Amino acid sequence: MASSDCEGHAGQEGETFLYFAYGSNLLTERIHLRNPSAVFCCVARLQDFKLDFGNFQGKMSERWHGGIATIFQSPGDEVWGVVWRMNKSNISSLDEQEGVKSGVYVVIEIKVSTREGKEITCRSYLMTNYESAPPSPQYKKVICMGAKENGLPQEYQEKLKAIEPNEYKGKISDEMEDIIKKGESKLS
């Protein structure tokens, strides 16, 4: 886990922006596929939101073969994630990855708290028009690997591990399979 790079950076300034990741982009290898400028900033908590998994308009993700991560407002709950500092030149690739143009996710601005209690404004994404559905085992694994790699609180990691995946046993993309293999060897 890298040291915190959030000090003195309260929001979207200059040539960079802060992005709060709570799904597959928790894993460094995953976010770097399309967004090589991403630099670990810190672990943070989004208060009064809850993690969910779903299929946009009821259609299963062709990339992940199951529900994909989203968040929704839920008083008293919390979502832990990673804040990445990224070049503004990566906004379009991040939006594309998240399906903003096709309406899968909408961009939201949120305030998250660091472990030290500092509040930071970040860009994040919220899925619209979805039906709850379990993630594939592979998608869940990528999220759990990212949580471990970046030192999310152990209790939250246990919650992630307890998520029941669907029963998909096939392959996902070669690119993602490679990322899982690299991550497993790095984290073992």
Swiss-Prot record:
InterPro entries: G-Glutamylcylcotransferase (IPR017939), GGCT-like (IPR013024), GGCT-like_sf (IPR036568)
This protein's record includes keyword Cell inner membrane: no
GO cellular component: cytosol
Gene3D superfamilies: Gamma-glutamyl cyclotransferase-like
Protein name as annotated: Gamma-glutamylcyclotransferase
Keyword set includes Phosphoprotein: yes
Gene Ontology annotations of biological process type: release of cytochrome c from mitochondria
Binding-site residues, substrate: Y19, F20, A21, Y22
EC number: 4.3.2.9
Organism: Mus musculus (Mouse)
Active site residues per record: E98 (proton acceptor)
Subunit (UniProt): Homodimer.
Assigned protein family: Belongs to the gamma-glutamylcyclotransferase family.
Reactions this protein catalyses: an alpha-(gamma-L-glutamyl)-L-amino acid = 5-oxo-L-proline + an L-alpha-amino acid
Reported function: Catalyzes the formation of 5-oxoproline from gamma-glutamyl dipeptides and may play a significant role in glutathione homeostasis. Induces release of cytochrome c from mitochondria with resultant induction of apoptosis.
Keywords, comma-separated and alphabetical: Lyase, Phosphoprotein
PTM annotation (Phosphoserine): residues: S173
GO molecular function term, any single one: gamma-glutamylcyclotransferase activity
